[in-house]
């Protein structure tokens, strides 16, 4: 059910000014037990940003660490983009044309590019992302912290201050009408939406008199 249709300038927007296209009621995901929407949202964001194909078979799809690694790489690319200008992706080979910019940025943060973007190092991108994010954005020194202690810091920030780490797939959104920031970080990504031809005007009908049930005293079925 579509509750309201707004002009693009009134839709919530990301920190870079990009408006969202559709807003889904989060209750609709849990009530229908369709957690695949959340999975598709995260993988769609990763595929659109990293230039990859995200395939998720039922029993052999991406695990949590793999998804968090993808989200971490997106954040790393965006941070490098701020410092070294826009990055471009070769859509045929799915490789970064200006990957040296990302390498230089990671080297400045004492992180290994080959491990962060390597397929044989699961969890490396997530850990590097969280260490950099906690130090640069939250002012928390992570040099002497283990990965478990880092995850605990991320959990506390999320629970106590409503601050979402980059690996959670959430983003800060601003109200398109007032420009004010929403209280909670919100999941944002890419997802395929299909419109079904269920229109109210084809279903609504009314009558003054007609047959009714003797038990419930309600009108019988049909128009």
Describe the residue ranges of each PLM region.
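Long insertion/accessory domains within large nucleic-acid-processing enzymes
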Residues: 1-223
């Amino acid at each position: 059910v579509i509750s309201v249709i707004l002009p693009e300038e009134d839709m919530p927007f990301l920190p870079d000014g990009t408006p969202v296209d559709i807003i889904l009621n989060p209750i609709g995901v849990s009530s229908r037990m369709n957690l695949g929407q959340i999975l598709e949202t995260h993988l769609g964001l990763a595929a659109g940003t990293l230039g990859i194909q995200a395939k998720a078979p039922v029993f052999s799809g991406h695990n949590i660490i793999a998804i968090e690694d993808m989200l971490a790489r997106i954040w790393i690319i965006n941070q490098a983009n701020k410092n070294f200008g826009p990055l471009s992706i070769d859509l045929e080979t799915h490789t970064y044309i200006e990957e040296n910019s990302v390498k230089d940025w990671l080297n400045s943060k004492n992180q290994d590019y080959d491990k962060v973007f390597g397929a044989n190092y699961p969890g490396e991108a997530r850990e590097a992302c969280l260490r950099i994010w906690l130090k640069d954005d939250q002012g928390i020194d992570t040099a002497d912290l283990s990965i478990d202690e880092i995850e605990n810091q991320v959990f506390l920030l999320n629970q106590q201050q409503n601050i979402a780490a980059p690996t959670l797939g959430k983003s800060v959104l601003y109200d398109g009408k007032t420009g004010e920031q929403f209280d909670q970080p919100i999941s944002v990504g890419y997802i395929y939406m299909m419109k079904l031809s269920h229109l109210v005007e084809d279903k609504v009908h009314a009558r003054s008199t007609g047959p009714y049930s003797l038990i419930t005293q309600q009108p019988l079925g049909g128009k």
